[in-house]
Amino acid sequence: MISKTHTFVILASGHGRRMNSDLPKVLHKIGSFSMLQHVIYNAKQLNPENIAVVVDQPLIERLKCFKDIQLITQELTLGTGDAVKTAMRNLRELPDSSIVVVQYGDTPLIKSSTITKMISYLEGKALVCLGFRTSNKEYGRLIIENGSLREIVEAKSDKNNHEEFLANAGIMVACAKNLRELVEKIECNSSTHEYYLTDIVSIAVKSNLNVGYVITGGEEATGINNRNDLIKAEFYFQENKRKIFTDSGVTLVAPETVFFSLDTQIARDSVIYPYVFFGTGVKIESGAKILPFSHLENCLIKSNAEVGPFTRIRGNTTIGNKAKIGNFVEVKTSEVGQNTRIKHLSYIGNAKVGQESNIGAGTIVCNYDGKNKHETNIGSNCFVGANSSLIAPLNIHDESVIAAGSVIVEDVPEKSLAIAREKQVTKRIK
């Protein structure tokens, strides 16, 4: 009987020299999130008992901000076998029957559904591995005999040099008892002085244990070793996201020009126009329209709102139902009420704008005094004339009007007209 509890062991040590970067490989981003965040995010979809990440010392400080994971330090980077051995020694209290999923931090596109399939296939087996078909002959290979996995070898060690083969995706699933016993039997490779996790397949077979395998698509199994691999993975990620959204009822007018983050949420009947970028933390409710060349991050766009073109929204901003945020408008750390219009050339920062208000073209909320940021509150049914500067901290109460061209430095009472500009002087030219 397969255990219902499982633990993820994610291998993330090693810098990744082929990336040619000061940043550790697993922290390079796809869809605005690091590779490691992708792996952790997908693991959490399965509600595991524990997520353990094996890292080397240089990486551990960078990962302390990660929540709900256990960091295990691999003192010396002696290969994947040593990494899993180190993890299992740190997880000694894990029940023998608990399922352990071993995954690489640089293989970020593996779906939780694929892991579920591997877990379900574990019944009656000591170990289940993941393979995929590819024309790239550099991958390690799964050697299959009579329907059973016999060993995993490097491409150069494939004696038969098969034209068609299953490549090794690197993901393994086993019960804790078997994994503990098998990794302890891995011997150090005499030429590289490392311990290879893939050796446990042949070790299991020699112990008369059954080893199974599951096949997935090559795009999902993409491993990342260099910048070109990163480009491919980003492409596959975006293509998959576009399909997910269109299948769920979102209209993408030109899908190939729209870019998403891992956590982007868009409800059905929304329309996304060309050249829109979604950063982290964006949620779009049903019926909203995002017009071309808009850049959104950390914001909520409510039902039937319209944003863009050429709009930037960020900083935990909420745009209310049926509100319109127009061209060349930036809204940051603000709340915009239902049916409010901010249509042209404006900056709204650290502000709350009520319902049914109109913010005229060229309005600037001056929220920063050089040291600190201050709040501005604009009530409902207000009209702010064009080219107005609102100097925070400031309160403009309901149903008030700000005359065009004003510089407002004092609070404006309810149902009031505020004018703050020089009187026009007109003289005849001689």
From Swiss-Prot:
State the top-level EC class.
transferase
Note down the stretches annotated as region Linker. 228-248
Record keywords, A-Z: Acyltransferase, Cell shape, Cell wall biogenesis/degradation, Cytoplasm, Magnesium, Metal-binding, Multifunctional enzyme, Nucleotidyltransferase, Peptidoglycan synthesis, Repeat, Transferase
Q: In the Enzyme Commission scheme, what number(s) does this protein have?
A: 2.7.7.23, 2.3.1.157
Stretch list, region N-acetyltransferase? 249-430
Q: Which Pfam families match?
A: Hexapep (PF00132), Hexapep_2 (PF14602), NTP_transf_3 (PF12804)
Q: Which GO terms describe its biological process?
A: cell morphogenesis; cell wall organization; lipid A biosynthetic process; peptidoglycan biosynthetic process; regulation of cell shape; UDP-N-acetylglucosamine biosynthetic process
Q: Keyword Nucleus: yes or no?
A: no
Binding-site list for Mg(2+)? D106, N225
UniProt-recorded Gene Ontology molecular function terms: glucosamine-1-phosphate N-acetyltransferase activity; magnesium ion binding; UDP-N-acetylglucosamine diphosphorylase activity
Which residues are named in the active-site annotation? H344 (proton acceptor)
Question: Could you say which residues bind UDP-N-acetyl-alpha-D-glucosamine here?
Answer: 25, 74, 79-80, 104-106, 140, 154, 168, 225, 314, 332, 347, 358
> PANTHER family under this entry?
BIFUNCTIONAL PROTEIN GLMU (PTHR43584:SF3), NUCLEOTIDYL TRANSFERASE (PTHR43584)
The record's note on quaternary structure and interaction partners says: Homotrimer.
Record-stated family: In the N-terminal section; belongs to the N-acetylglucosamine-1-phosphate uridyltransferase family.
Protein name as it appears in the record: Bifunctional protein GlmU
